[in-house]
């Protein structure tokens, strides 16, 4: 199984630690943005082409995953559109933290709504058996 972690850029160290835990469970992380993140996100200094390349790489990483793990309480911005994209395209979404109104509505009324959990530990416990299959 492949999994993409959605979180605020500033939480890249936490995401890298989650990547290690995923690998130990036999789950391949695809969120390469976190492996490369260093310091604060500085989009203002990027050209339009650079922004597009980053966005395109992240989208391809997300599209290659069968599960997206959303760290909703990390004050992310782009992550909400990534989560919506995952739900639209049939990627299973595991939502850690407080859900948004839209995520809750998708969970109740949508065919591919997120699975809500309180902590990363809860998410990994639920996903653990799936990685070895």
Label each region the model flagged.
Residues 1-133:
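Conserved catalytic or regulatory cores that recognize and/or transform ribose-phosphate-containing ligands
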């Amino acid at each position: 199984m492949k999994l993409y972690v959605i979180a605020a850029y500033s939480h890249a160290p936490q995401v890298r630690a989650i990547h290690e835990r995923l690998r130990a469970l036999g789950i391949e992380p695809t969120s390469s943005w976190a492996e490369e993140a260093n310091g604060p996100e500085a989009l203002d200094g990027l050209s339009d082409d650079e922004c597009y390349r980053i966005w395109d790489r992240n989208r391809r990483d997300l599209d290659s995953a069968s599960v997206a793990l959303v760290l909703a309480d990390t004050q992310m911005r782009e992550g909400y559109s990534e989560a919506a994209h995952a739900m639209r395209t049939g990627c299973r979404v595991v939502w850690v933290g407080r859900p948004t109104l839209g995520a809750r509505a998708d969970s109740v009324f949508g065919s591919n709504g997120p699975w809500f959990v309180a902590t990363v530990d809860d998410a990994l416990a639920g996903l653990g058996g799936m990685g070895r299959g």
